[in-house]
């Protein structure tokens, strides 16, 4: 129940998703041929002991590549794109004496597809961070509904569990008799949890010492959150090496903007949550609506919200699959061919 239970976590998920989509768009469609590859070159008239220089394609220079594949084996599909932009060395006759023309001729000794490095490092970190943050959200929401939460006003009533309402409707409509076992179980769980929360707020150290499993669960939840955020922030801090000369300025600006927004959003929610008064008395329970309208309204709202969220998940997954199938050849052509 991501969209219903935690709007603050949904905000972060949306920003991470947008960051990944923008990065994927640049890798597949946005990168021009000048921003794809870098070449380790040496001037044609230079000695063999001259250091290699990494540079991107330059239309004012003539790049001469090796006529055959490297000794270690055939070129990878990613590297083949880079070698397709240069001329084979045996197809050009150089002057015997190095001159102005020879200084504009570069012998290519190695080529690297920077989009491959961008896909294997930055994009992979974003995807892993996205999944880890979703795992944190799922674990946190289950703990708010069934586990120990402090402050107490952060707890979610277990009676709102979707399976409880679904079981009651199925038993009433199809079996023609009320089914209340899940409801009684959730009520007992709510009473026990309120007692545990009071013990935890009174003495957290002793509470966690006698119940280490709860501490392990909370620790795993925090670990998932900070590792996910660390991976997202790491996408802006990792060194791109020689490939930095091929990335345009807007890619760097976009990366830092998304990383800053995600980090500041999480920091804001953490500080706002920590400033909430822990000794605040719980609000008085609202009066329950009488009649069929109140029962049906509350029941249907929770069920329909759960169904709507799950339909949104299915629609997103189906959309990604359909787009991948529709543009599969285009994506492969962008990544592997000219």
Swiss-Prot record:
It is found in: Host cell membrane; Host endosome membrane; Host Golgi apparatus membrane. GO terms for biological process: fusion of viral membrane with host outer nuclear membrane; symbiont-mediated induction of syncytium formation. Residues 141-212, 265-301 are cytoplasmic. Its main location: host cell. Residues 1-30 form the signal peptide. Keywords: Glycoprotein, Host cell membrane, Host endosome, Host Golgi apparatus, Host membrane, Membrane, Signal, Syncytium formation induced by viral infection, Transmembrane, Transmembrane helix, Viral primary envelope fusion with host outer nuclear membrane, Viral release from host cell. It is a multi-pass membrane protein. Residues 31-121 are annotated as: Involved in fusion. Residues 265-301 are annotated as: Interaction with UL20. Pfam families: Fusion_gly_K (PF01621). Glycans are attached at residues 48, 58. The chain crosses the membrane at residues 122-140, 213-233, 244-264, 302-322. Interacts (via UL20 interaction region) with protein UL20 (via N-terminus); this interaction probably plays a role in the coordinate transport of protein UL20 and gK to the trans-Golgi network (TGN), and is required for the cell surface expression of gK. Glycoprotein that probably modulates membrane fusion events during secondary envelopment of cytoplasmic capsids that bud into specific trans-Golgi network (TGN)-derived membranes. Also plays a role, together with gB, in virus-induced cell-to-cell fusion (syncytia formation). Seems to block fusion of virions with infected-cell membranes. Belongs to the alphaherpesvirinae glycoprotein K family. This is Envelope glycoprotein K. The lineage of its organism: Viruses, Duplodnaviria, Heunggongvirae, Peploviricota, Herviviricetes. The gene is gK.
